[in-house]
Amino acid sequence: MTELNKLTVAESVKGLKNKDFTSKELVNAYIKQIEKYKNLNAYVTETFDLALKQAEAADQNYGQNKARTLEGIPFAVKDLFCTKGIRTTACSNILKNFIPHYESSVTQNIFDKGGVILGKTNMDEFAMGSANITSCFGNVISPWKANDDNSDLVPGGSSGGSAAAVSAFMASAALGSDTGGSVRQPASFTGLVGFKPTYGRCSRYGMVSFASSLDQAGIFTRSVLDSSIMLEAMMGFDEKDSTSINAQVPELQSAIGSSMKNMKIGVPLSLGEGGIIEHDIMKMWHDTIELLKNAGAEIVDITLPHAKYGVAVYYVIAPAEAASNLSRYDGVRYGLRVECENMTLDEMYEMTRSAGFGEEVKRRIMLGTYVLSSHCMDAYYFKAQKVRRLVANDFNNAFAKVNAILLPTAPSAAFKIGKKQNDPTIMYLNDLFTIPASLAGLPCASVPAGLSARGLPLGMQIIGKQLDEYNVLKVASTIETGVKHIKFEPAGF
């Protein structure tokens, strides 16, 4: 029998319904795995007592035929979703001991379906990073190793703890957030399915804000079917979020395995020109095109002429919004406060923020403050917003001809911890292919599609029209089926 912690969400639900095992046994299997691999630093707060209590309640519900969709399913939560009574820090010293008095809407939605929380996962501080190396709790280590080198690799970021937890079988699924690629890129690096729904599909209420016009909850799973199950539980209109979309949550599970007949897939191959993409990634892209063509899809050449400006636009708009959002951390109402005798209020602000924020967060606050200053706003911020509109228009034009768009998730496989740490510009380019869809607020997923020559997982990205998570899942499922001969599991776990 498969080890309990290696079951997918769908398999776990089936096993619990059939009384093959109890939720308590399932939770204990995950707790054992978490204890065994603490060296990965995937979790920053463990909630084992609560998990076992929730599991006991789930087992009672199964016994009384009252089981809900996710009854007894253990999951992990990125540490920027507020969890009532459970420490929530965004992995920043400025919030290191903050305990919320309310629950985020997304976590509440999962609890309402019977989910069991194992703990809060590590992340880049305030979700600012692509390698999970800016956390105040230290780096997350990927469970994957290259076949020619035993060096520790990054799991991707900013949701690296969630990615490492699911990849190393320390959670059946894990919540992440995706602002410019923070679910999709780690999913690519760790051999997982990572899904970011349409902006507004999942409530942002109770999420610690980075860039409000871009932030969106996402999910890590080990299968496309699991993604559809979790998304159905997570999504929904919320009056507490002014950006929430009042649209019916679709039935998504029927997308899995459905026919690709009459599907048109757009491929912007011009984005791969210029030697930006590693050879293995380019080969995977072409192999996936052939896979979809053989499955019955029509491949259409498209262009996204303004996508090349995505990174530049993102690093104007996102830091500008971050500078505004993070101004609330002043040491007065909650979080860290640095105090000295005879200090003024301004000095307290300065010392608290200097001590509480890490270097990358400070860099982005300074950049955001600069582009919002009166003499720079026209030249940078307003211009970036105009180009953002052009990026969205490019997608609209493409979707007039196709049902979905296919491109790589990241330009490379996972890299060594510290390799790109000293050059922010090179680090920012990790999100080269994920940022454009975020700027347009589109649903997208990363699905494992191949291995590099060094044995590391590579992900393909599928982008859909607004509110069309169904077709994204359909294409992702077809790719998953086409590469089922490849084992996307880290060795030794």
Curated annotation (Swiss-Prot):
This is Glutamyl-tRNA(Gln) amidotransferase subunit A. GO terms for molecular function: ATP binding; glutaminyl-tRNA synthase (glutamine-hydrolyzing) activity. Its EC number is 6.3.5.7. It holds the Pfam family Amidase. GO terms for cellular component: glutamyl-tRNA(Gln) amidotransferase complex. It comes from Rickettsia prowazekii (strain Madrid E). GO terms for biological process: translation. Belongs to the amidase family. GatA subfamily. Allows the formation of correctly charged Gln-tRNA(Gln) through the transamidation of misacylated Glu-tRNA(Gln) in organisms which lack glutaminyl-tRNA synthetase. The reaction takes place in the presence of glutamine and ATP through an activated gamma-phospho-Glu-tRNA(Gln). It catalyses: L-glutamyl-tRNA(Gln) + L-glutamine + ATP + H2O = L-glutaminyl-tRNA(Gln) + L-glutamate + ADP + phosphate + H(+). The keyword Nucleotidyltransferase does not apply. The keyword Amino-acid biosynthesis does not apply. The active site is at K78 (charge relay system), S158 (charge relay system), S182 (acyl-ester intermediate). Heterotrimer of A, B and C subunits. PROSITE patterns: AMIDASES (PS00571). Keywords: ATP-binding, Ligase, Nucleotide-binding, Protein biosynthesis. InterPro entries: Amidase (IPR000120), Amidase_CS (IPR020556), Amidase_dom (IPR023631), AS_sf (IPR036928), GatA (IPR004412). Disulfide bonds: none annotated. It is an enzyme of class 6 (ligase).
